[in-house]
Amino acid sequence: MAHALLGPSSASRWMACPSSVRLCEQFEDVESEYAKEGSLAHEIAELKVKKLIDPGLTSRKFTSAMKKLKDKELYQEEMQGYTDEYVEFIQEQMYSYETTPHISVEQKVDFSQYVPGGFGTADCILISNDTLHVIDFKYGKGVPVSVENNAQLLLYALGAYLAYEMIFPIEHIKMSIVQPRLTGIDTWECSLDYLLTFAKKAQEKAVMALNGDGDFNNGEHCKFCKAKATCKARANANLELAKYEFKSVDLLTLEEIGEILQKAKDLDKWVKEIEKYALSESLKGNNIPGWKAVNGKGRRSFKNTDDAIKVLKENGIAEELLYERKYLTLAQIEKVIGKKDFNNLVGDLIVMN
């Protein structure tokens, strides 16, 4: 699927650091396994919402389509429970209106009127009377995403408003992020005036980005930047963190320890990103002065476990010595039976240590 140069998913970065846009053009797009897993979960969620709103999607067609998704390599049964939470939230929102709202799923929205070449795909859009509600499904479990002033969703809302402004008297904007593996559901609201003010700001940043203007800015937005490992501005910012000035006393205060730990955490993250990049370059045959890629010791394993066990048993090794029977961990059990059933059955038996 084609992505806009100034797309919604990277808006927090290009609005905070416009110069990063041209810099990132030097790097190829690489889709991680986590991203692929998220895409599959989105497909499942989309199918379920369509079953909810499309009378033409018969049970037979739905079952057939779901089977194809379940046959994919990255499919996990827990995806069913997590996507159910997203669908149930949409259903709740639909029923909260006095009249049946307009609803669209996986709709392409265009906001190029403000951001040149700007477009994206909104997971779900609900419109009733003067209210436009954008709902976004995030399957990741790494870092919670805040919905407040979220640039990605604001651009989705902007595109949806431009598409429907002649049909609905939109004055009120709602945005929700459903993160079932993390914080659950978060909603934030703003006025149309606020959205259009944001649009003007996005327009200014977009022009700067396309022209390669503005300074490079280090921050949380660097997390998903393709140039994060080799960006000199980020390197300078992180090296500044290392220049910690101590007061002329023999012992650190608790406040100083807290500050040092936070700086060390940020530095450690940056160094690991550089190490990962350096390793990938070494494996490509590029020379990193003073460093080289070496083979790790690795872990021993049988070429074929079944064959190995068979040989051991044939040579008098008792079968009970070769197996270990134990319960799965809490997380493994939840994954096997699904989050919803897990919580219903044993949720009240869980304690936090």
Where in this protein do the model-derived segments appear?
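Short, charged/polar micro-motifs that form catalytic or ligand-binding hotspots
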Residues: 27-35, 142-150, 215, 250, ...
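Metal-dependent nuclease catalytic cores that hydrolyze phosphodiester bonds in DNA/RNA
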Residues: 1-132, 172-174, 264
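Short acidic (Asp/Glu) and glycine-rich catalytic loops that position anionic groups and cofactors
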Residues: 18-24, 176-186, 226, 238-246, ...
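Mg2+/Mn2+-dependent nuclease catalytic core
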Residues: 36, 99-207
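Hydrophobic/aromatic-lined pockets within catalytic cores
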Residues: 49, 53, 139-142, 157-165, ...
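Short, charged, low-complexity amphipathic alpha-helix
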Residues: 174, 196, 200-266
